[in-house]
């Protein structure tokens, strides 16, 4: 039996939800027993473990509030990779953005048989701009040692109610317990997508939330998930996307690929860029139109390749727009590609943009339409 099959059959066999009779962890409640623990109960070679995590996503009438709490045990501070953490935040081209609030984080250690905690300071917070639409707030926890416990909580406020971040129940370290709740008005419709090799079990309920809204009766739907001991996820060589096998769930506002296409076509940062006149290239286009189609296309491609510089930023939407790009000569991947398509069409070479996912994000799921999939 090959390594791939052995790894995942093994994960399937031990992915039994072992129910805990103890109380759920609460922020600030760290015990000497937890700090003195030197090895994980089920995975003795684990470098760290998630003692508990909880996520609550609440759609508050078109805006999303997400509460996150995690408690992490560090067994090997040099190899765990869990002595810091990051939060991904999305920003639309219109300037709407997700924001993080009320972050509190501590590292706990034992000194003279007493619990001592170190608070995360502002100078230990960093921002990494991944693309025009995505940034990551990174937090480097202080005073992390073998045996430490890291604990943090924060809130995300998002104007994108249709875009609920994926919730992972499985990581590269064991997760002892995980709770996840999603609450939304009944008139909101979401697609649900589950990942992993073991089906998730959820509980659903509804309750009245006071006066009726303009969309009808004000009923809130709640979906609840709970897992106990999910084993660490082991990567396998040559696997295209390990996240397809990570136990997780994702909710996204219902739409269709046709609606996604219409949204892109009408966007001032995408489709409308293809209609820009590009006056500085008028003479160039008139000249290349005299060439055969193949030479015409090669000439335009070479012109764009020589004239413009990629700023190393990804994104399906333009950053500068093709007009500004033609003046400043630098832009993101959408700026340059949409200008190329615009020029090809002006030269009577019918060209259409194609939008997909990056290879690292795995294959595009056609059954789960949405802008966040692209």
Model-derived features with residue positions:
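Bacterial Sec-dependent N-terminal signal peptides
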Residues: 1-26
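Alpha-helical structural motif
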Residues: 8, 66, 99-101, 176, ...
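Residues at structural and domain junctions
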Residues: 8, 56, 136, 166, ...
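Polar helix-capping/helix-linker motif
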Residues: 15, 75-78, 307
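N-terminal hydrophobic or amphipathic segments with adjacent small-residue motifs
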Residues: 16, 141, 325-327
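Beta-strand-rich, non-transmembrane domain signature
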Residues: 22-268, 272, 338, 345, ...
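Active-site neighborhood of thiol-dependent amide/isopeptide-bond enzymes
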Residues: 133, 289-374
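Acidic low-complexity segments
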Residues: 235-319
């Amino acid at each position: 039996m090959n390594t791939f099959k052995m790894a995942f059959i093994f994960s399937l066999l031990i992915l039994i939800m072992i129910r805990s009779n103890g109380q759920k962890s609460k922020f600030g409640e760290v015990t000497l027993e937890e700090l003195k623990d030197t090895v994980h109960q089920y995975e003795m070679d684990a470098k760290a473990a998630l003692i508990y995590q909880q996520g609550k996503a609440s759609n508050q009438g078109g805006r999303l509030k997400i509460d996150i709490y995690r408690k992490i045990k560090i067994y090997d501070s040099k190899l765990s990779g869990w002595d810091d953490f990051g939060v991904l935040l999305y920003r639309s081209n219109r300037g709407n953005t997700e924001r993080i609030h009320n972050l509190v984080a501590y590292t706990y250690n034992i000194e003279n048989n007493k619990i001592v905690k170190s608070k995360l300071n502002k100078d230990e917070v960093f921002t990494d701009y991944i693309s025009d639409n995505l940034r990551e707030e990174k937090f480097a926890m202080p005073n992390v040692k073998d045996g430490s416990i890291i604990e943090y909580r924060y809130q995300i406020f998002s104007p994108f109610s249709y875009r609920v971040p994926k919730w992972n129940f499985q990581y590269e370290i064991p997760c002892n317990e995980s709770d996840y709740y999603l609450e939304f008005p009944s008139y909101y419709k979401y697609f649900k997508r589950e990942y992993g090799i073991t089906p998730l079990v959820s509980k659903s309920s509804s309750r009245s939330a006071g006066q009726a809204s303009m969309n009808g009766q004000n009923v809130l739907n709640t979906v609840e998930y709970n897992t106990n001991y999910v084993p660490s996820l082991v990567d396998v060589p040559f696997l295209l996307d390990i996240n397809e096998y990570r136990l997780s769930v994702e909710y996204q506002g219902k739409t269709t690929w046709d609606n996604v296409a219409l949204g892109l076509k009408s966007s001032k940062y995408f489709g409308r860029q293809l209609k820009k006149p590009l006056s500085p290239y008028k003479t160039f286009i008139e000249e290349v139109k005299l060439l055969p189609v193949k030479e015409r296309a090669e000439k335009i491609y070479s012109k764009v390749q020589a004239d413009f510089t990629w700023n190393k930023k990804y994104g399906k939407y333009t950053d500068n727009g093709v007009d500004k790009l033609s003046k400043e000569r630098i832009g993101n991947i959408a700026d340059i590609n949409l200008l190329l398509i615009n020029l090809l069409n002006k030269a009577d070479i019918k060209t259409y943009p194609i939008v997909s996912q990056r290879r690292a994000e795995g294959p595009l799921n056609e059954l789960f339409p949405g802008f966040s999939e692209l």
